[in-house]
Amino acid sequence: GVKQLSSIEDEYKGVRQGTGVADNRYSTHSQTTITPSSKIIVMSAAEVWFLRAEAALRYNTGDDVENCYKQGVTVSFAQWDANGVSDYLESDDRPAAYVDVFDAKFNADAPSTITPKWDNTADKEEKLERIITQKWLALYPEGCEAWAEQRRTGYPRLIKVAVKDRKS
């Protein structure tokens, strides 16, 4: 069963890396079980669309960058049976600051102001950030692939680790 370690019931809050979770107020991750018969995603349709968007942006391949970007988001939503893709693609919402529910010393400003809504007037770097940020989200649950994208491009911009002590 799920062990409730905090006073916040029926709600999950993310924990910033490096905050140290030794004090029972935070739940820890669960163990992953992968077997030879586990189904894994080698490359999703969303990843292909985002690769095409990036290639069109960088190398003028003839694909429409905005269309490829929107298709990537759309098929990612479809992959997970998520609703609201049209509203999401029109959203000007920016990433929120991280607010630790127990200790304000771990609070952090949002590292980016990128929105889901495509902006044709943006410069090439902002367009790349938008593409890769959505690609990173779409790569779930393939953490290694998402990590490689972040290392390759620097996107998405992530909140820095609070304490570098190998415990979190």
What do these predicted ranges mean?
Residues 3-167:
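Acidic/polar-rich alpha-helix caps and helix-coil junctions
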